[in-house]
């Protein structure tokens, strides 16, 4: 939620400075009325990349502000995950993406975005889609209006982006592309 003070709107991505100190939260009495968002990505490093399928069919492209995880399903299965972090969600209850696009054009394919550990074990799945036998047809972009509640007591997480494209010999993909992840 934005803070409006003297007709000036301060977004959660902005700064509130009081007596020369940058505040992370503003309270009115005992009620918190503004909290600065915490950036997970860009910022969180790639802690682990796991290629779980046919090596050449899994790619990760990361320029520091945009990350793309892609699995190609050809004669073999493309499957892998990138793990970003660690980061602490202590004091935050929700997560959102400024732009995360998940799309699948292949059958027997999946995309998954989860909170978990460095080994790729997920604690909470945020986004998951499995095409089963149908030929793709999944293309969704999640933005700042799509809030995900963090529902685990654990506060130390990694963000896991996982793609799996079936061995269908069709040469089609399962892809996740993200350019911002924030805690509020």
Where are these regions (language model features)?
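Short beta-strands within extracellular/lumenal beta-sheet-rich domains
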Residues: 66-94, 140-146, 175-179
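Short beta-strand-plus-loop segments that form exposed binding edges in beta-rich domains
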Residues: 161-170
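Extracellular carbohydrate-recognition regions
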Residues: 31-58
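Intrinsically disordered, compositionally biased repeat/linker segments
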Residues: 1-36
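A short beta-strand element within beta-rich, extracytoplasmic domains
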Residues: 90-105
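Beta-strand acidic-aromatic groove motif in beta-rich domains, primarily in extracellular
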Residues: 105-115, 171-174
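Extracellular carbohydrate recognition and processing domains
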Residues: 120-154
């Amino acid at each position: 939620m934005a803070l409006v003070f003297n007709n000036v709107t301060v977004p959660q991505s902005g700064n509130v400075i009081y007596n020369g100190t940058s505040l992370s939260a503003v309270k009115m009495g005992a009620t918190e009325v503004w909290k600065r968002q915490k950036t997970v990505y860009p910022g969180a490093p790639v802690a682990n990349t796991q290629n779980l399928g046919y090596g050449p069919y899994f790619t990760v492209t990361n320029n520091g502000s945009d990350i793309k995880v892609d699995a190609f399903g050809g004669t073999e299965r493309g499957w892998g995950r990138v793990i970003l972090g660690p980061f602490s969600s202590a004091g935050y209850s929700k997560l959102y993406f400024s732009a995360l696009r998940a799309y699948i054009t292949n059958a027997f394919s999946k995309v998954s975005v989860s909170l978990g550990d460095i080994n790729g074990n997920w604690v909470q799945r945020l986004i998951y889609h499995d095409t089963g036998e149908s030929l793709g047809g999944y293309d969704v972009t999640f933005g700042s209006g799509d809030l995900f509640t963090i529902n685990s007591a654990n506060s130390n997480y990694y963000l896991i982006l996982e793609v799996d494209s079936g061995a269908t010999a069709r040469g089609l993909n399962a892809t996740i592309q993200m350019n911002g992840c924030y805690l509020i």
